[in-house]
Regions:
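Well-ordered beta-strand positions in beta-sheet-rich domains
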Residues: 4-8, 129, 144, 174
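Positively charged, helix-rich recognition surfaces that bind polyanionic ligands
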Residues: 28, 138, 151-357
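Long, hydrophobic, amphipathic alpha-helical segments used as structural scaffolds
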Residues: 34-41, 81, 85-92, 163
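Short, glycine- and charge-enriched coil/turn segments that flank and shape catalytic ligand pockets
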Residues: 40-50, 54, 88-89, 167-171, ...
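Acidic carboxylate diad motif detector
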Residues: 50-150
Length: 357
């Protein structure tokens, strides 16, 4: 099974320069190959199978970087292009912009070219190993790794490892999960996870830093310092959110053998401008992704409720259906048939739990 481990790395000046070259060359090759494919498609109506090797004679500086990074850029483009041919309504794949402050490239471990030793990681094409902050160890075979630079200026490496993951002992517990905005999640066992609202708590600080940034002269060192402060706060908020999602998803997976969650169409919900910001902050999709891969790792069953399953409209006691909860302001479900009065989210979680029966 494949599992990724992310660590902070601390490259020296020479290594930073090499990474910058790789980031730039990967972007260049991706964009050049995409441009040529679009031109070829417009002329012939067919796809062009070009490769990075074709450009090295014309652009000799491409030979200075990791060839596997360029090959992975081609693989990413191939995936994007296949998606284009499946659904042309979205248009051609997008070009990668220089203005994007998130940089990355992926390389592969071929015959031991990537390894960790004594607090350093060896990478292809680099003369010296890079210092790594390995806060936790891993076992298994390194398959690939992705080097990235965040807008804050920090460097990270995500190491993909083929490893054996120990299944958790079987549990007789099952749970239904209703996700929301007021409470991040309400569980059928009566637990409720409050929405931590990391972004909302940092909004004033973020607004001040963004005002400071807007007042700085474009291109000045002071503007760059201000930009980094904004980026670091965004990074902190993202890390807090990910930490919360990891802790809650792991807690649920450890306790329960079967988990049921709604099949929420987040893209459609985001069209509601009154709720879009709150929905983006709670990261339901990422939470579901975590439950998905962790359930596969640890031998649990994740059940996705059908899109048309009316979990919030059914009475969890008698099964009667009522449309009262279509009004989001309605927080208590009152069954017109049996008289049950219950919190709408808890009622929905109990209905989701029934899908494990």
């Amino acid at each position: 099974m494949l599992k990724a481990y992310k660590y902070r790395i601390y490259p020296d000046a020479e290594q930073m320069q090499f990474f910058a070259k790789c980031f730039g060359c990967v972007r260049f090759v991706y964009n050049r190959m995409l441009s040529d494919r679009i031109e070829h498609y417009n002329l012939t109506g067919k796809s062009l199978n070009n490769t990075p090797a074709q450009y090295k004679s014309e652009f000799t500086w491409l030979k200075e970087v990791d060839s596997l990074a360029l090959a992975n850029a081609q693989m990413n483009l191939n995936t994007a292009y296949r998606n284009f041919f499946r659904d042309k309504s979205n248009g051609f794949p997008k070009f990668k912009s220089k203005k994007n402050n998130n940089f990355s490239y992926t390389t592969n471990n071929q015959k031991g070219t990537v390894y960790v030793e004594n607090g350093y990681i060896k990478l292809p094409k680099l003369k010296s190993p890079v210092k790594i902050g390995q806060h936790r160890s891993f076992e298994g075979v390194i398959k690939s790794c992705t080097i990235s630079k965040a807008p804050s200026g920090k460097y990270h490496i995500s190491i993909l490892v083929e490893t054996e993951i120990q299944k958790l002992p079987a549990s007789d517990m099952r749970v239904g999960i209703d996700v929301g905005i007021k409470d991040f999640a309400v569980l059928s066992n009566g637990e409720a996870y409050k929405n931590p609202k990391h972004l909302r708590k940092s909004e004033k600080r973020l607004a001040k830093l963004q005002r400071d940034l807007s007042r700085k002269q474009i291109g000045s060192s002071n503007r760059n310092k201000a930009r980094i402060k904004v980026a670091k706060l965004h990074e902190k908020i993202a890390n807090q959110r990910m930490d919360f999602l990891h802790k809650k998803s792991t807690e649920i997976i450890r306790k329960n053998q079967a988990i049921v969650i709604e099949d929420l169409k987040v893209k459609n919900l985001m069209k509601n401008h009154n709720l879009a910001k709150s929905i983006a902050e709670v990261s339901w999709s990422r939470f579901r992704e975590m439950l998905d891969y962790k359930s596969r790792w640890y031998g649990r069953e994740l059940i996705i409720a059908p899109p048309d399953y009316p979990s919030s409209q059914l009475c969890s006691d008698c099964g009667n259906r009522s449309s009262q909860t279509k009004d989001l302001a309605c927080r208590v479900y009152i069954c017109p048939e049996c008289g049950l009065e219950i919190d709408r989210d808890y009622n929905a979680s109990l209905n989701l739990l029934k899908l494990t029966m």
